[in-house]
Amino acid sequence: MELSFTKMHGTGNDFIMVNGSNYPDLDFSKLARQLCRRHFSIGADGLIIVLPPESVEHDFRMRIFNADGSEAEMCGNGIRCFAHYLRENNLTTRDVLKIETLAGIITPEIVSYNGDKSLIKVNMGRPHFKSEEIPVNIEDELDYVKNFPLKIGNKKLNINCVSMGNPHTIIFVEDVNQIPVSTWGQEIEHNPLFPQKTNVEFIQIQSEDEIIMRVWERGSGITLACGTGACASVVAGIKNGLLKNMVTVHLPGGDLNIEWQEQDVFMTGPAESVYTGKIVIQEG
């Protein structure tokens, strides 16, 4: 079977985009495992499926699968690529969209569109802090998991937990370049403290409006960027009195601008097409 796709990225967080309406019988989890393998297939951090909405009040529905085949609730860089895909493929002429995700309705706005690249601002919704909402397995439920001690090997870390529709664990460090992101990230992701696993962000504070971030994504490993992670990290920094309300997040794949005024979080960043193609996949 021949499958059409588009390869896109948002600040280096790369995705394979597929119009799911054309392939209603595909196992998308299996497809993600097949296509996201770097060096052996197309290679990507995740697979994004474009679908019609379940409600007439919304525009489209997004499903996103990590490289390991697990389905994610939401992805900040992915939702920007999703909006860019819709415009590039003439599936919409609207600038503001209502997209159904497992994390709820997300509203991206196409600020500018220039052929293969867009600048997109996304209302990411409100962050959640209660331990049961993230979720975090803590005996005494907390309104905010702030600087909670977690031992990794011989190292004791202070973690902060925020949900942006998906779970994030934020750790403030002096120098992100000195952190074994792969080792610590994998251990924290699979720690029994997190029944649904967790994304892990390591944050170096540059100033009140600037941070450096490294990320270990649940189900994908080290990536060049994570939009929901950038949002969660800025929110955690503000909650800890370390950051102002508008922050630039420096990631290996580029910069994201995050704003939080105690209600909804807004993220602004690019989305870019890399190429389109077709690949033969085995059914069944």
From Swiss-Prot:
Coiled-coil blocks: none
Pathway listed: Amino-acid biosynthesis; L-lysine biosynthesis via DAP pathway; DL-2,6-diaminopimelate from LL-2,6-diaminopimelate: step 1/1
One term under GO cellular component: cytosol
Site (Could be important to modulate the pK values of the two catalytic cysteine residues): 168, 217
PROSITE patterns for the chain: DAP_EPIMERASE (PS01326)
Keyword annotations: Amino-acid biosynthesis, Cytoplasm, Isomerase, Lysine biosynthesis
Positions with a binding annotation for substrate: 13, 66, 76-77, 166, 199, 217-218, 227-228
Gene Ontology MF annotations: diaminopimelate epimerase activity
Entry annotation: catalytic residues: 75, 226
EC number: 5.1.1.7
Top EC class, one word: isomerase
Biological-process GO terms, alphabetical: lysine biosynthetic process via diaminopimelate
Domain of life from the UniProt record: Bacteria
SUPFAM superfamilies for the chain: Diaminopimelate epimerase-like
Reaction catalysed by this enzyme: (2S,6S)-2,6-diaminopimelate = meso-2,6-diaminopimelate
InterPro entries in the record: DAP_epimerase_AS, DAP_epimerase_DapF
Compartment(s): Cytoplasm
Family: Belongs to the diaminopimelate epimerase family.
Function: Catalyzes the stereoinversion of LL-2,6-diaminopimelate (L,L-DAP) to meso-diaminopimelate (meso-DAP), a precursor of L-lysine and an essential component of the bacterial peptidoglycan.
Assembly and interaction partners: Homodimer.
Protein name: Diaminopimelate epimerase
Organism for this UniProt entry: Halothermothrix orenii (strain H 168 / OCM 544 / DSM 9562)
Gene encoding the protein: dapF
